[in-house]
Swiss-Prot record:
Keywords: Repeat. PPR repeats lie at residues 288-318, 319-353, 354-389, 390-420. Belongs to the PPR family. PCMP-H subfamily. Residues 58-98 have a biased composition (Polar residues). It comes from the Eukaryota. This is Pentatricopeptide repeat-containing protein At2g25580. NCBIfam families: PPR (TIGR00756). Residues 521-615 are annotated as: Type DYW motif. GO terms for molecular function: RNA binding; zinc ion binding. Residues 40-98 are annotated as: Disordered. It holds the Pfam family DYW_deaminase. Residues 490-520 are annotated as: Type E(+) motif.
Length: 615
């Protein structure tokens, strides 16, 4: 996990946030130098210090707070600096030393420290024990394997060291836990999880003997790292930090867990969302209304409508906002009919809707392509509930028309509005016109938007593209990301159209060709107009096989458990041919596939999609 894991400076780990990297690096350097390399052979200090008390005895005598602990460690590290350099230089100048000479020079002066240290940091070697060159080399090898992220060999090396009586130190265990958490995707996840549990148990054993002041200081650092990961959207690393804090007997509070839940929704981390929900449920026996709303929003943004419905049904208290969230969740994830049914249930329970709830219904009708029902609800809004339509309601109605592609009707509705359409109305129509390929109408709307509010149009909008937020441009760094796959061995992978450099390239495309044969048998006809190159028909069909979402689909089928659902996230709108192909392939392999493009979620199962082919 941390930067200083061996006798010599190493490259900084990507796990550390920029804000704390230098400070923690310096702290760990001081800690490793002062605690893990105590020189019991130093004539000036040996008479003052009982090896059975360890360095922590000095901390208790000289300090009273976590800040003073850090200062004490720093002071001790300075006193040991010259001796450390002398020993390292001696090692380099004497490569042919015998084991006995190594034992003589390095007795008590390397990573081996007193097993009775109350802070539990370091190895379990007593000051009277000696270390041979073989163990020393194995420790150096372990550090190198961690730097190279070679999980398999690092675990094997740790087992060999334990057989020789060396107990891994606290910092190295943290690093190894990180590698087990983020391990190589081609290494068996079951092995990594088993190793992670084992390593966390070792950390917990060390923490049980950790001195209180040092434990508080180290815990504070880990909490700062957790907050930094949440701030920068690093969900997996934040979850890893929670595991480390749990092994240190620290329970993350509910407010921090809810913050992570919001980040999961923004990052669309499906498995992580369920993990965070489990940790939240374990931390408190009863969630209040606002906490449940966070969970509903998280599952809604991740495309997990069933999980959101489960949270909704378990809620003992609901208000108007609760119903708005669940109706919007069903609508945006392709369950428009369920959204309408939920609205009917809302009215049957004697509740009175507001404009926001009706806007959710308009959106659901638009996703269903049922404009007529949406207009009936619009009439009911003012007739039955006395709600005067606002400009936000008219924006939602324009969206309802345009979502299924009724662009001419949407323009006619705008021209018949009883109030002057504002920039939001024209911007909504502009975006959806370009999504559906009506560039002429999109350009016309763009001219109106520029006249009303020029700040609404960025460079992409003026050039005829769908407007994107500045934050999205920064996040993507203007780099095209194609199919992103969630759910394969609890990992996320990225694919690009036509990528032939994958480790399993032959198997992937062979599977796609076999699936195509079965698809043709059930009536599939390739939409070759989606292949824009000037090539023959057969070449176009071959080109379509290399679309990123199909590669992601094949990768999931080959590398995940049978019948297990998975998710494909597309950075652009899913093309018609891939949409049809994914529906049929999901039926052939018996999988549920959740596909997310720039417009909506598609949940494909048994050859059908929740979007009803409206997207």
């Amino acid at each position: 996990m941390y930067t200083k894991l061996s006798l010599f400076p190493r490259k900084s780990s990507s796990l550390l946030s920029i804000a704390n990297e230098k400070r923690i690096h310096q702290f760990l350097r001081n800690l490793c130098t002062a605690v893990e390399r105590l020189d019991f052979g130093n004539s000036n200090d040996s008479s003052e210090m009982n090896p059975r008390e360890g360095y922590n005895g000095r901390i208790q005598n000289r300090t009273g707070s976590s800040g003073e602990v850090s200062e004490s460690i720093h002071t001790q590290s300075q006193s040991l600096g010259s001796n450390q350099g002398r020993n390292e230089q001696s090692w380099k100048q004497s490569p042919s030393l015998s084991n006995s000479q190594v034992q003589s020079q390095y007795q008590g002066n390397w990573y081996g420290t007193n097993s009775d240290y109350q802070n539990g940091v370091g190895s379990s070697w007593h000051s009277g024990k000696t270390i041979d060159r073989e163990v020393y080399d194995m420790i150096m090898e372990f550090d190198e394997y961690c730097i190279q992220e070679n999980v398999r060999v690092a675990l094997t090396t740790m087992e060999k060291l334990e057989k020789k009586g060396y107990v891994m130190d606290f910092v190295r265990l943290l690093k190894l836990t990180q590698l087990c958490r983020e391990g190589n995707v081609y290494y068996e996840v079951s092995v990594l999880e088993e190793a992670k549990v084992s390593v966390l148990a070792k950390i917990r054993a060390l923490v049980n003997n950790l001195e209180a002041n040092y434990l508080k200081y180290y815990t504070d650092i880990m909490i700062e790292e957790y907050d930094a990961f949440c701030k920068h959207g690093k969900v997996k690393k934040a979850l890893y930090t929670i595991d480390i804090l749990a092994s240190m007997n620290y329970v993350v509070d509910l407010s921090r867990l809810l913050r992570l839940a919001k980040i999961c929704g923004e990052a669309e981390g499906l498995q992580e969302a369920k993990t965070v929900h489990g940790k939240i449920s374990a931390s408190v026996s009863h969630l209040d209304l606002s906490s449940n709303h966070v969970l509903l929003e998280m599952y809604s943004n991740c495309g997990l409508a069933n999980e959101a419905a489960s949270v909704f049904e378990k809620m003992s208290e609901k208000n108007l906002e609760t119903w708005c969230i669940i109706i919007r969740c069903f609508a945006k994830n392709g369950f428009g009919e369920d959204a309408i049914d939920m609205f009917s249930r809302f009215k049957e329970e004697g509740n009175i809707p507001d404009g926001q709830l009706f806007r959710g219904i308009f959106y659901a009708c638009g996703m269903l392509g049922d404009v007529d029902e949406g207009l009936l609800h619009f009439e009911s809004m003012s007739r039955d509930y006395g709600i005067a339509p606002s400009i936000e309601d008219y924006v939602s109605l324009v969206e309802m028309y345009a979502l299924p592609g009724f662009l001419d009707e949407a323009l006619e509705f705008v021209e018949r509005m009883p109030m002057e359409p504002n920039v939001d109305v024209w911007e909504t129509l502009m975006n959806l016109s370009r999504v559906h390929g009506n560039l002429e109408l999109g350009d016309y709307c763009a001219e109106v938007v520029e006249f009303l509010d020029p700040t609404r149009l960025n460079k992409q909008s003026r050039e005829g593209f769908i407007p994107v937020k500045a934050s999205d441009v920064e996040k993507e760094s203007l780099k095209k990301r194609s199919g992103i796959l969630h759910g394969v061995k609890s990992s996320m992978q990225e694919f690009r159209a036509g990528d032939t450099n994958l480790p399993e390239n032959d198997e992937l495309f062979q599977l796609l060709r076999n699936l195509k044969m079965h698809m043709v048998e059930v009536g599939y006809v390739a939409e070759t107009r989606m292949a824009l190159h000037d090539i023959d028909q057969e070449s176009k069909e071959t080109l379509l096989l290399g679309h990123s979402e199909r590669i992601a689909f094949a990768r999931a089928v080959l590398n995940s458990a049978p019948r297990k659902p998975f998710t494909v996230i597309k950075n652009l709108r899913v093309c018609v041919d891939c949409h049809n192909a994914l529906k049929i392939m999901s039926d052939i392999v018996g999988r549920e596939v959740i596909t997310r493009d720039i417009k909506r979620f598609h949940q494909m199962k048994n050859g059908a999609c929740t979007c009803k082919d409206y997207w």
